[in-house]
Amino acid sequence: SYYMRLIFFLLIATLGLYSCNNDLTTIGQDLINNGNHIEVQTTLLKETGTIKIDSFITSSGRYGSAITEMFMGRYKDQYSGVTTASPCFQIVPVSRPSINFRYLLDSVTFHFKVGKNIWGDTTETATPQTLSLYRLARLPEFRTDQNDYFYNRDSIPWGDKLATVSFIPKRMIMNQVYFKLEKDTLTERMFAMMQNDDPIFRPNSNSEISYYKFINYFKGLAIQSGKDNNCLLSLEMIPDSLYMRFHYHNADQKYTYDLKLLSQRNEYQYFNVKNIPS
């Protein structure tokens, strides 16, 4: 029995030594299939560019539906550079005026309502924003080669400056901001035309635009941003949010008459957008 245990022990030891053989010469003898590979190429990059997808409807075209929102102002950041936006639109009478010759003109104001969207610095130390109101020198010209649309780079036919306003871009402040026009030749003449019941204030039954004669006389308005502005503001494009108001009186009685945003046909309304990359 002693010899049997000894023989069994020697057999186990021999098998253990054989299984622990450290001969490495057999490693790597078999080929392993590999579907991956590394390829190195050298390319000379000559030009690069950035493609920007337009996120704003800048024009409804001659037959499109109304634009409900435009943008105005100037905004600068380190990624997209400097972006400026200037809206262009028309105003028309809301009714035929009935103003007696005894009434005297006090002032003329232009009111606008900032929409929901604001880009830029609106903190307590925000930079005052400056906007200037211009009269259009002529009606914008359609791009007949592009389906009668205006594009974001189409220039605005700037005319005379009518007023300037500066304000801090805080919501409560902006809700009370308006332009105050000077009592000059233009406003005095328009008020006199109202008193004389001039034909431009009468609706045209045979035209697609009721007050087409008025638009031929007063081509429209545009708003320009100051060069130091740092906010882009949305602008509500509805008649009750964009209007020119004439303030006048007779004795102790005060009155107003409004020229509001054209909503019947708005093909001449668009806004110009420019971007200077960083």
State what each model feature region is.
Residues 2-10, 14-278:
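Secreted, disulfide-rich extracellular signaling modules
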